[in-house]
């Protein structure tokens, strides 16, 4: 049926994205790349770009996708590639001198990149401004913003949530990639957030899993994910945050991903 076909299509996209991301990670050599937070978000990116309206024509009616946990560019760029906004040649320049595709994204609407990221928490406040402008123009498009759970340690996230509730920005949808890890280790050990669900609710946001009904308030999706999902030697390991792939480790990671999708 239609839903099963959609799931199969998304799984194929994720498979392609992960293999391409591993190629890109290998190409950085001793500089390394942010693998863990990208591989926890691959499914989020694949699903998001399958429903959002994005293009390279600067259309004011386009949806805005703001990546606040901006170090997950291996997922971001490969999603833009699957969407047709980037080509393989673009990806081959990843993090090299003169590239447009750095380890943190630089805003370039031609490539569908809406926001220059890097400083955690700023993406949500930027998204609030974009959503407010759309609201004042009576536009019906959406603003999607991706946060990390570790990123929710930032005070600016909670200031932004107050603004979202105050201005009743029902055109803004927050997705939290809750992989349980941040730079220095497990999020619960660094700064225990206890119940993110209750915190978001206290700011007047609606928690949901599917976007299938209208709402008068902003919504948040908390996605429980796995750091470096699918890569056996990096999963749920703080070393996955930013690491170097040797050729041997790259080959093992490819083997793991192929095994993960075997038969699908």
Model-derived segments and spans:
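N-terminal capping segment at the start of a domain
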Residues: 14-31, 177-179
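Cofactor-binding active-site loop characterized by glycine-rich and histidine/acidic residues
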Residues: 28-29, 39-159, 165-166
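Generic beta-sheet signal
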Residues: 63-65, 141-145, 172, 217-225
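Short acidic, glycine/serine/threonine-rich loops at helix termini
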Residues: 77-79, 106, 156-158, 184-188, ...
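A short alpha/beta connector and helix-capping loop motif
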Residues: 154-179, 222-223
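Active-site pocket-lining segment
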Residues: 170-188, 197-204
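Glycine/aspartate-rich loop-and-adjacent alpha/beta segment that forms the canonical ThDP
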Residues: 199, 206, 215-264
